[in-house]
């Protein structure tokens, strides 16, 4: 990977960070997506949850050796850490790969201690699990849907049977 490619990634990250940080403050949310596979050379999704970062790397074919890939990923994490101020030891990394029949998507992954934190969104609190599963349990791209349900379901009770996380 050339220095120019890393510079492109850093520039994109900075642009996204400035815009989305302002937006997060305006919306009073403590969890938001910083980057979503915007550049083909960086097939990752980067999400901020309070003072933690969740990185999902999309498995793909590439011409990098295992060693080169390791160097690429460490440099990528360093750029993210420098940009956000979140240290690498507060980053949680998952590998997303194509699954036939979605086997394993909802299976517990972690063999380490669970890291579950509380995040804020639209006056609500959600628990997110950064370690145990492929997903955190809170899908950030569904924020508008949650806002709609929050407005429509005011002063009512309902049971969400369509989401294994209960947060959609």
Spans of features found by a protein language model:
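Conserved alpha-helix/loop element of class I SAM-dependent methyltransferases that forms part
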Residues: 140-156
